[in-house]
Every structure is written in C-alpha cells, then in structure tokens.
A protein has these predicted regions:
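Extended alpha-helical regions
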Residues: 1, 24, 181-185
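N-terminal secretory signal peptides that target proteins for export/translocation
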Residues: 1-23
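Hydrophobic residues within membrane-embedded alpha helices
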Residues: 2-4, 24-30, 113, 209
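Bacterial N-terminal signal peptides
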Residues: 28-40
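Boundary at the C-terminal end of the N-terminal hydrophobic targeting segment
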Residues: 42-47
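Active-site-proximal helix/loop segments of hydrolytic enzymes
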Residues: 49-51, 75-256
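Short glycine-rich His-centered loop
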Residues: 50-70
Length: 256
C-alpha cells in the first residue's frame, strides 16, 4: 500500500531524463565551441590591427610656416596629429607618434621610427603656406585647401598612393577641397599632379617620404597664411572633423 504523504507524486522517466541531459550537454558543448570561436576571432582581429606612425611636422625650434595670426605651423600640426592619433587609438590601432614631445628630431629619424616598427603607414601632418612672391603680392586669400604628397622614390609607392587616395576621398566627403597650387609651374612648386580631384601630388625628394621603407605620405591640411582658412583650421570642430577623416582613410587603406 502506498503511503499518502500529502505531497504530489513525482514521476521520473529515466529515458526522458537521459535525453534531456544529453541534449543539455550537447548544447553546452556547442555553446562552448561557439565562444571559443568568438574568442579566437577577437584575438585574430586584435593581432591584425595596423601600426601607424603619426608624425607631427616640424618642431618648436623650427616651427615651419607662420599663420596670418602669428601662430606657428607646429602648433597646428600638433593639434591635428593628436586628433588623428586619438581617433586611430580609439579604434584599437597601434599608434606611434614622432615630434609630439617638442624635442628636436631629424627628418630621417622620423621615417626610421616607422622603418624600425615595420609600420603599415607613416603619415606626416603639416599646414601650408604659399611662395614668398605671392605673400609679398598680398595674395594670401586666394589660396586654401589641403594637399597630399607621395614620393615615387619610396619603395612602397603604390601602397602610398592607395592610402593617399583613401584619405583624399574621406577629406572630400568631410567637405574639404583640394589645393592645386603646388602644381603651378613656378619656382619652388611645379609638383606633378597625380589626382586633381583628390589633391594628390608627387614630391619625390621629400626626405620623410623617400627614406621610409614603408608606405608614406605627407598631408598639408590647409593654408594658414590665409586668415579665413587659418581661423577655420583653429576651430576644435574642424580639427576633430579633419582628424576623423584622415584616420578613416588610414584605416581603409591599411585594412585592404
């Protein structure tokens, strides 16, 4: 006779229990496998991140051009290169900086840093002036826009040009316009124009480009001797927008 305990009867089906347990184990194993694949993919993605050398053009002792306001180019270069580096770093890229600490550094030492690091790209950030004859003639307000330079003497010229195109496309998409002034057939300029729409020129003798053994390019972000252009380039929003555009172009070309 079954004793009535007052509790509901529990029926255990051993076959059903085994089936449920077996299914649970299979599900657990499958989940563990999926997690392992995700972790492996994340590790591979991290390993695939690019090494980028972001060079701040000039130094405090040799600050480059002087803007219409009297502020020197190095300060503009420092602001924009910091924005580019921050954007790349936020996306997990490995960023090395040169000339950001204010110390003197030779041009060849800048590219050597990229060579030693086996960097995926060396990019030098500058701001532009115009020839002295144009300054003396008071033509500053006629010139504006960015320019990108690559060197055919760089052994990775094709990759350099590809990166220049990617950056040029992002700058155009960000609302910037290219300056074609450096292609003018005048003394000190006359740089071969590779792509007028994207503002890409060849400047074969630029030391930081020709001594790099990795893809390399130089960007003139805008013309600071033009007072209107200088004021725009000094704005925090402009710096952030340019930094984001340049970083996006870098990531597009190094991921290819």
């Amino acid at each position: 006779m079954r004793r009535d305990t007052g509790r509901p009867a529990t029926v255990t089906n051993n076959d059903e229990s085994m089936t449920i347990t077996s299914g649970f184990l299979r599900g657990t194993i499958a989940l563990a496998g999926a997690l392992a694949l995700v972790c492996a993919s994340a590790t591979t993605a991290r390993a695939a991140l690019s090494t980028i050398v972001v060079d701040t053009g000039h130094t405090p002792a040799h600050p480059g051009a002087t803007g219409a306001s009297g502020r020197v180019e190095y300060r503009y270069n420092l602001d924009l290169s910091a924005a580019v580096a921050a954007e790349l770093g936020a996306h997990g890229e490995h960023v090395l900086r040169t000339s950001a600490d204010g110390r003197e550094i030779a041009l060849s030492a800048r590219s050597a840093r990229a060579n030693d690091a086996h960097a995926d790209l060396f990019v030098s950030i500058h701001h532009d002036s115009i020839q002295q004859a144009y300054l003396d003639a008071g033509r500053q307000r006629e010139f504006h826009g960015y320019a990108i330079f690559v060197s055919e003497r760089n052994p990775r010229y094709a990759a350099s040009l590809r990166c220049a195109r990617e950056i040029g496309e992002r700058l155009r998409a960000a609302g910037e316009t290219p300056s074609l002034y450096h292609a003018d057939p005048i003394r000190g300029e006359n740089r071969p124009l590779i792509d007028a729409r994207l503002g890409i020129h060849r400047f074969d003798d630029l030391v930081v480009l020709r001594t790099a053994r990795v893809p390399a390019l130089l960007i003139e972000a805008g013309v600071i001797v033009n007072p209107q252009e200088e004021a725009r380039l000094a704005q925090a929003d402009t710096i952030r927008r340019l930094g984001a555009a340049i970083a996006a172009g870098i990531e597009a070309c190094t991921a290819a």
